[in-house]
């Protein structure tokens, strides 16, 4: 198969979302004195993280919108402290988002992969992330020069894994389905989404999770 266009997920495929976000949350924990309410940062993180992942899954499926996600993820950990004011919660979220744009830790091998691909392929980011942070993250981490364009779910008005965002990406990059490839870490969003859109896939799977329902292309 001769590929010409490669679509790559950003979060946890290139940009180390887990560690970068954890670092930001630890800064918030210190700066907002959450230690007055939680026994440790890890106790705070262990409550926040599963809830945040659940919210993102609901966002991908269309069960909730962006505003619900960004409000509820911090409201969930602040409500037990007696903090339910929407303005305060959104302020904490905005602070968190701003901090994420300054973090530059990459997934091991990310630059080497892009250096290998850039001479031979057209490269695009395909992400469910938010516009106000994704471009800054890409630029500050030194990744922007590798890509022709970033396609966001906010542009397509639909999230991965839905077929519509893949169709949107193909149309807006003048790419052919048969000559395109999707690289990502999320089995549901990236791999199932691309598979159902009849786009070949490379699954970044460092944890060695089992494929369910079909075998990815690579």
Whereabouts are the PLM-identified features?
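Structured helix-beta-strand junction loops
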Residues: 51, 119-120
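Glycine-centered short loops/turns at secondary-structure junctions
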Residues: 120-121, 198
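Conserved phosphate-coupling serine/threonine residues in phosphotransfer and NTP-handling enzymes
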Residues: 127
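Conserved SAM-binding loop
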Residues: 14, 106, 123, 158, ...
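Short beta-strand/loop segments at the ligand-binding rim of alpha/beta enzyme cores
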Residues: 121-124, 177-179
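N-terminal helical cap/lid subdomain that shapes the substrate entry/recognition surface
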Residues: 2-108
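Asp-based, Mg2+/Mn2+-dependent phosphohydrolase catalytic module
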Residues: 1-6, 19, 111, 115, ...
């Amino acid at each position: 198969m001769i590929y010409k266009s490669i679509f790559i997920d950003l979060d946890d495929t290139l940009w180390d979302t887990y560690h970068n976000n954890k670092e930001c949350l630890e800064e918030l924990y210190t700066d907002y004195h959450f230690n007055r309410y939680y026994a440790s940062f890890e106790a705070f993180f262990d409550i926040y993280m599963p809830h945040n992942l659940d919210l993102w899954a609901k966002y991908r499926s269309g069960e909730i919108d962006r505003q619900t996600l960004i409000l509820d993820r911090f409201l969930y950990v602040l409500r037990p402290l007696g903090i339910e004011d929407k303005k305060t919660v959104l302020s904490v979220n905005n602070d968190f988002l701003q901090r994420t744009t300054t973090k530059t830790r990459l997934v091991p091998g990310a630059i080497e992969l892009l250096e290998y691909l850039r001479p031979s392929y057209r490269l695009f980011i395909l992400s469910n992330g938010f516009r106000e942070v994704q471009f800054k993250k890409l630029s500050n981490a030194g990744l922007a020069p590798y890509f022709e364009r970033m396609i966001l779910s906010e542009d397509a008005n639909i999230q991965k894994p839905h077929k519509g965002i893949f169709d949107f990406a193909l149309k807006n990059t003048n790419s052919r389905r048969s000559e395109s490839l999707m690289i990502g870490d999320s089995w549901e969003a990236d791999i199932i989404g691309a598979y159902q859109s009849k786009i070949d896939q490379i699954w970044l799977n460092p944890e060695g999770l089992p494929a369910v329902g079909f075998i990815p292309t690579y």
